[in-house]
């Protein structure tokens, strides 16, 4: 098959969906398929890996940028007559699309809980454009499959856009178990020493480029309220560090919070922790949850995140209702560190077992099956 993947940025230096697209391209090339990428930007060191078809966009405003990419990427995909066109994000006129970004219709309700504010924000050109793009894409008869990363997003796509059940597929993110594995725990002491963290203190790990939306404020409050007063927090990712350091200082836990920035060795940081915590306001499926579990780290997340699909409370982690559920986070932290060392080790083993059932190879195999289904339908039409 000649497959075109559509993604604004083809990169290993950006977010999870960008890295996932690179993995897809490489894996399908290994399977003997011809791969092209339709996008706006590509890392210089990836240029020789694939045929890259650049999309010229109007960047005058965010709304124009998103709309022009969706239209022009779709035009290129149709002109070249690929066997399969697959959008990882928002693009028009493709054979299949994968929901990797937050559904804007739902996100506005989560982000702006006040009804008046929400109504005003819906008139914002950027928000209005994204909602319109989603409506057109998910109701387009030429789009044969809509792929979601979790049960949460599957339900939301049906709720907001009435996508027929037969068009929907849920294909979970996979994890590279050669990179993320429990062996990283052997570096626990060394990593903690590098970061100035005592080898024996209970350590929570948080990883995100969106401190506010992923609940860092609530996490700090929960740590301050916890009866385990020695609990510390490792914050990975870039964001308004000074602002959140001030919040930690005001809560009296400033000396227990460590901002380590963006790390290329994030798997080693997982191995240094005791509990991964990411109570997102809304997220289709944060891959960091799966990465952490593959390294043996139990996960605390919110039921408003697709990542909740892989967490069994008390077995592989803990669930809280929302990003604002400080009391429930406090209770979860207390329960986790009330467990005996043996019980926490058992939980760690269960996490690894869960992640091993979701290797990246499963994702590739299921995606290939999807492409074969779509290609058969196109040939029969």
Which sequence ranges carry the predicted segments?
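Membrane-proximal helix-turn-helix segments that form the acceptor-binding/catalytic region
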Residues: 125-149, 155
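A conserved mid-protein helix/loop that constitutes part of the nucleotide-sugar donor-binding site
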Residues: 19-23, 202-225, 242
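Aromatic "clamp/platform" in nucleotide-sugar-dependent glycosyltransferases that forms part
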Residues: 262, 281
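A short helix/loop element that forms part of the nucleotide-sugar donor recognition site in Leloir-type
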Residues: 181-197
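A short, well-ordered alpha-helix in the C-terminal region of glycosyltransferases
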Residues: 193, 342-357, 369
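Carbohydrate-associated surface elements
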Residues: 152, 174
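Short hydrophobic beta-strand element within catalytic cores of glycosyltransferases
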Residues: 298-301, 311
């Amino acid at each position: 098959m000649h497959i075109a993947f559509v993604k604004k940025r083809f990169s290993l230096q950006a977010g999870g969906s960008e890295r996932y697209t690179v993995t897809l391209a490489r894996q399908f090339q290994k399977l003997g398929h011809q791969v092209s990428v339709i996008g706006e930007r590509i890392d210089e060191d990836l240029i020789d890996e694939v045929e890259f078809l650049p999309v010229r966009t109007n960047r005058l405003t965010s709304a124009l940028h998103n709309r022009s990419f969706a239209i022009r990427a779709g035009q290129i995909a149709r002109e070249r007559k690929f066997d399969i066109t697959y959008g990882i994000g928002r693009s028009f006129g493709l054979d299949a699309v994968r929901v990797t970004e937050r559904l804007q219709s739902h996100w506005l309700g989560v982000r702006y809980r006040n009804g008046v504010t929400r109504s005003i924000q819906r008139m914002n050109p950027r928000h209005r454009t994204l909602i319109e793009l989603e409506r057109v894409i998910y109701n387009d008869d030429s789009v044969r499959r809509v792929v979601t990363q979790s049960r949460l997003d599957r339900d939301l796509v049906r709720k907001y856009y009435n996508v027929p059940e037969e068009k929907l597929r849920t294909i979970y993110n996979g994890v590279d178990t050669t990179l993320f594995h429990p062996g990283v725990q052997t570096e626990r002491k060394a990593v903690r020493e590098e970061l100035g963290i005592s080898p024996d203190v209970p350590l929570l790990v948080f990883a995100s480029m969106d401190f506010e939306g992923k609940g860092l404020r609530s996490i700090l409050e929960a740590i301050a309220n916890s009866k385990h007063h020695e609990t510390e927090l490792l914050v990975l990712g870039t964001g308004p560090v000074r602002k959140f350091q001030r919040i930690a200082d005001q809560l009296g836990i400033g000396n227990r919070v460590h901002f380590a920035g963006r790390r290329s060795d994030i798997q080693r940081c997982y191995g240094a922790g005791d509990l991964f915590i990411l109570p997102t306001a809304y997220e289709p499926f944060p891959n960091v949850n799966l990465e952490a579990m593959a390294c043996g780290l139990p996960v605390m997340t919110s039921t408003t995140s697709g990542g909740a699909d892989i967490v069994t409370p008390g077995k592989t982690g803990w669930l809280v209702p929302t990003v604002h559920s400080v009391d429930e986070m406090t209770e979860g932290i207390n329960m986790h560190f009330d467990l005996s060392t043996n019980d926490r080790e058992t939980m760690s083993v269960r996490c690894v077992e869960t992640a091993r059932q979701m290797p990246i190879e499963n994702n590739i195999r299921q995606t290939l099956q999807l492409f074969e289904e779509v290609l058969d339908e196109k040939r029969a039409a």
